[in-house]
Amino acid sequence: MQSVQGTQAMSDPTAVRPADKRAFLKWAVLGAVGIVNGYATILMYSRGEVAFALLTLILTTLALYIFGSRKTYAHRYIYPGIAGMILFILFPLAYTVGLAFTNYSAKNQLTLERAQSVLMDQTFQSGESYAFQLYKTEQGYRLLIEDGDERLATAPFSLSGNVPTDLNLEVIGGIDGEVEPIKTIIGYRTELSGIDLHFPDGEDIRMSGLRKFAAVKPLYTLQDDGETLTNNQSGQVLRPNMEIGFYQPINESGEFVGERVSPGFVVSIGTHNFERVWKDEGIKEPFINIFIWTVIFSVLTVIFTLMIGLVLASVVQWEALKGRAVYRVLLILPYAVPAFISILIFRGLFNQSFGEINMVLNGLFGLSPAWFSDPLLAKTMVLIVNTWLGFPYMMIFCMGLLKAIPDDLYEASAIDGANFIHNFTKITLPMMIKPLTPLLIASFAFNFNNFVMIQLLTQGGPNRIGTSEPAGYTDLLVSYTYRIAFEGTGGQDFGLASAIATLIFLLVGALALLNLRFTKLSQQ
């Protein structure tokens, strides 16, 4: 009986198979992903974020194709990695390079259309201003305007829901109601700003402050060409200057004259930001000095951490040393503590007035070094702290490499009468240098862009004098870029910072390639 029922169930065309359920669920999920991301793409594009809209479109299209087609089944396992690489590496890189060729800054953030709209919204007071009061009556709110000895008021209206945009003023003797405090006016400021009041003689006034209504007019009028603006107060004619990204007044011959008018807008300026790095002495000189210091800092950090790490790795693996496990744990602690905590602790220890290091030096030798004021001492302090943070990692790596070297080699060298120097130069170093090379290159690249270290310890200080942009003696290129982008004297200059970031990328890439090239030559 059960077999007959099973046969009938298998032959029933209305029965839903598990494979059909999985297919339906898959296409339902893919459809939902496509709809949500498609809607997000449209929103971003409509708001002018073309780059982010294109990124979302590419990632979504790839996901739908890879997970929806049987031909690309194997690619499903590598798609998360590819998407992450596009999202966190390629896109930021391309976006930064793109910004380097624009004037994008704190003063130039809008599009031309948006900047024009902001200017069109500006107004100026073209007539007398009048004090007002907001009354609350049983029928609603009323505005009272005082024109000399004359008192005029509006009809009752509502400030919630359907707020009127035009109200007539009539001469009255008084109002039965309570005067609203200033906090109520502040709360309804948006609604009150949209109301036009009309005097009996035809004069129109609008809210010009928390206590005043005045006759105001648009400051600019847009001409028929869709770009030219006329200043209704001064009569000046303005046009967008596409070379600097600002509206500027023009003379009768159409040449730009006078001061630029904010807000600015984003325009393409070609290689101007890169040219500033080499032509502006206020940027060129600190850039070259900071680049040299960055290379020295990275190289010395790698050398110091490797030397200390290798020596300590050899010591803690010395069989005659008792308590080696305890020493290993203690020496690894600097690596276990989060770097930002250690940096802030060292910042307190090196404090020139209250730091424990200066207290000890002053008590023993009568010295009180100016760690944060003297350029040489500041660089020394940075190297000391960075070496402290980096040697445990090198020590751990060297411990593993030393374990991999056969003891027979050292026994044979001992029979030949070799000392520890010959053992290190002829056995240890040659066998460790090949696996160490990628680590040393990675350590160099990391310290080349060690922003956290500089920002938390010295913030780039002490500052250099006579530079166009903020720059310090301990600044690395990456922290110098950050200061230009967010602490610039002339405002946040994201375009120039992006140009320097692009140069940093090219420099680090070139140095890494040179290191790899020299490594291959030395191995050959």
Swiss-Prot record:
Key words of the record = Cell inner membrane, Cell membrane, Membrane, Sugar transport, Transmembrane, Transmembrane helix, Transport
Listed transmembrane segments? 23-45, 50-69, 82-104, 290-312, 325-347, 380-402, 436-458, 494-516
User: Which GO BP terms, alphabetically?
Assistant: maltodextrin transmembrane transport
Is the keyword Cell membrane assigned to this protein?
Answer: yes
Does this UniProt record's set of keywords contain Transmembrane helix?
A: yes
Q: Which residues lie on this side of the membrane: Periplasmic?
A: 46-49, 105-289, 348-379, 459-493
Query: What InterPro entries does its record include?
Result: MalF_N (IPR035277), MalF_N_TM (IPR048464), MalF_P2 (IPR029345), MalF_P2_sf (IPR047103), MetI-like (IPR000515), MetI-like_sf (IPR035906)
The compartments listed are: Cell inner membrane
Q: Which residues lie on this side of the membrane: Cytoplasmic?
A: 1-22, 70-81, 313-324, 403-435, 517-524
Q: Sorted alphabetically, which PROSITE patterns does this protein's record hold?
A: ABC_TM1
Question: Organism's domain of life?
Answer: Bacteria
Q: Which SUPFAM superfamilies match?
A: MalF N-terminal region-like, MetI-like
Example of a GO MF term: ABC-type maltose transporter activity
GO cellular component terms given for this protein: maltose transport complex
Signal sequence span is none
The principal localisation class reads membrane
**Which residue numbers delimit the ABC transmembrane type-1 domain?**
291-515
Q: Which Pfam families match?
A: BPD_transp_1, MalF_N_TM, MalF_P2
Which topology term describes how it sits in the membrane?
Multi-pass membrane protein
Return the similarity comment: Belongs to the binding-protein-dependent transport system permease family. MalFG subfamily.
- Subunit notes for this chain? The complex is composed of two ATP-binding proteins (MalK), two transmembrane proteins (MalG and MalF) and a solute-binding protein (MalE).
Its protein name is: Maltose/maltodextrin transport system permease protein MalF
Q: Which gene encodes it?
A: malF
